[in-house]
Amino acid sequence: MDMPANIQNQLMQFQQLQQQLQTIVMQKQQLEAQIKEMEKAMEEMEKSEDSTVYKMAGGILVSRNKEDVKEELSEKVETYKVRITTFAKQEEKMQKRLTDMQESLQKALQGTNIA
């Protein structure tokens, strides 16, 4: 038995939304990993008594003032945390939309006796 076109369309939208959600979750996880890496770098800099650190820039190490690098890293961490919050809100909205779409699809499929 063939599925009606509107149900096929809803199913495609559902799958696209799932893919978008997966992308957002992956981006959020990448940012979280980068934050952990930057926080670990800041911890290591705190342990160092040197006022100079080395930062990778285009495949070479460049000497930099430790305080400047700490400030840069702190700003990046804060920026990434804001982005993570945004991704979390998007993730929550998409999860709700997926749940609603899933319920709608199940009802539609039951109505056509395909489920």
UniProtKB/Swiss-Prot annotation:
GO terms (BP aspect): protein folding
One Gene Ontology CC term in the entry: prefoldin complex
Subcellular compartments: Cytoplasm
Keywords: Chaperone, Cytoplasm
InterPro entries for this protein: PFD_beta-like, PfdB, Prefoldin
GO molecular function: unfolded protein binding
Main subcellular localisation: cytoplasm
HAMAP family per record: PfdB (MF_00307)
The family this protein is said to belong to: Belongs to the prefoldin subunit beta family.
Binding partners and assembly: Heterohexamer of two alpha and four beta subunits.
Function of the molecule: Molecular chaperone capable of stabilizing a range of proteins. Seems to fulfill an ATP-independent, HSP70-like function in archaeal de novo protein folding.
Protein name per its UniProtKB record: Prefoldin subunit beta
The organism's taxonomic lineage, starting at the top: Archaea, Methanobacteriati, Methanobacteriota, Methanomada group, Methanococci
